Amino acid sequence: MAALRRRSDRSAGLSFDADLGDRALTTARHDIVIGRWQGVRDLLRATGDHWPLRTHRIRALANAAAGSSVVEAWRAAEPDNPDAAVLRAATEVTRVFNGAIAAGHGAGTDRDRIDVAVMACLAAADARPGDPTPWASLLTVVRLYEGGVARSELRAWWEELRRRDPYHLEGHVQMLRYFSARWHGTHGSMYDFARDAAGAAPAGSPLPVLVQIARVEEYRYVSDAAKGRPVRGFGQHWNHELAVTELLRTYDRWLGGRVPGPIRAEEAAELNYLAHAACCAGLTREGAALVGLLGERIALVPWVYTGDPAQQIGRWRGGAPPS
């Protein structure tokens, strides 16, 4: 991935910012690199209960902290700080996923290790009762259990998240992945979940983009299974009639109802999915508009699944679709 990033940066003059323009987050992540937790504490305190921004920052901080003991040092210094408990839970989840990735596909994950992360999530939920973030972390890690979890248990945790934020995007994304064919469901169950959530979302909510995220998940699953071989009937995956109709619906409901203004860091990851869908579908107006709206807040995912991210983005810069 690092080699791809370097190659992409040179090929189109683009850079990929893991923090998506959130400079305060960049500073806090640098503190983690040098072993300091105080900047992380101050950042999360300042973030408060802005759930989308908090989720964006917690996720990035957990990725940065997973290979260090900074979170443990913070917990030791301030054992009663609820933000430290929330970040520790997210970090444990990241560590378990990192271990699963290192072990390779089909290797399985030690159940005791998953249990540790689950208990950290539940402890964080107790420490900060109004915060949906620990519940999103919990919904993320439980899909690593072989066979998943009991549907009643999953539903109970899902309702805990929704009581705190009924339109919590990260929580919805994690449930979508749980219901995907890659994990504990099917393409059909994943799309049903995405479409139901999108249909219930208020105007201006990013939740309709769940349908485009589901389309990426299906593409990854089918492509991985094909192992480079052509897949019959898959050539229109991005631009068949339903895909385009749903893409335009997301574009209208999310961006049409959104308060005008620059894209914020906490919106950018999911907006990359919508821009990617428009570009893959060959929608000239929407693709160029979305790439322009993103500006420099380009994420590697999901572009990396369909080729060189910088080359794909570069072809749409300046309003010109790919030839």
Region locations from a protein language model:
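Extreme N-terminal leader/anchor segments
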Residues: M1-E78, A288-S323
